[in-house]
Each structure stands twice: as C-alpha cells, then as structure tokens.
Regions:
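Long, contiguous binding/interaction regions
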Residues: 1-83
C-alpha cells in the first residue's frame, strides 16, 4: 500500500479586501442576538490526500497547486499544513 500524506490548505481573503460573505454572517449573527461579534472573515479549507512520503516535496507541490489554482493570490492568502 503506498504511503500518503494529508495536506490542509486554509485560504482567506487578504487583509483590506472586502469580504461580503463575512459581513453577511456578521449581520446575521447580530440579528440572532450575538452582539459581541466585531468582525467576521470567511474563507475555505481544502483537504488533499497525497501519494507522497517526503513532507518537504509534498508541501512544495501543494504550494504550487495554490499558486496555480487553489488560491487567487491577488486577493487571497493561504496557509499549508502537511500531516
């Protein structure tokens, strides 16, 4: 059985980029009585199962995936975790 590594990519809008989904969630939370929420930023988490054994090369490959497809690096930032 081949070894696999799991990668988790957290993608968020960069600071200063308008987050309309986050604002909608913040407004809805206020409507529901959660008045202590000052800001909401919404993002996404992408999980990948990789047929790889070397953590460093797996992370480099996932970062390349982010740069080419998984994140819009003009307006989004990302963080990669390898487990």
């Amino acid at each position: 059985m081949p070894s696999t590594l799991k990668a988790r990519v957290h993608v968020m809008l960069k600071d200063g980029v308008l987050d309309p989904q986050g604002e909608a969630v913040k407004h809805a939370l206020g409507t529901l009585g959660f008045s202590g929420v000052e800001a909401v930023r919404q993002g996404k988490v992408i999980e990948l199962d990789l047929a790889a054994t070397d953590r460093a090369s797996a992370e480099a490959e996932v970062r390349a995936m982010c740069e080419k497809l998984l994140a819009n690096t003009v307006i989004e930032k990302y963080r990669v975790e390898i487990a």
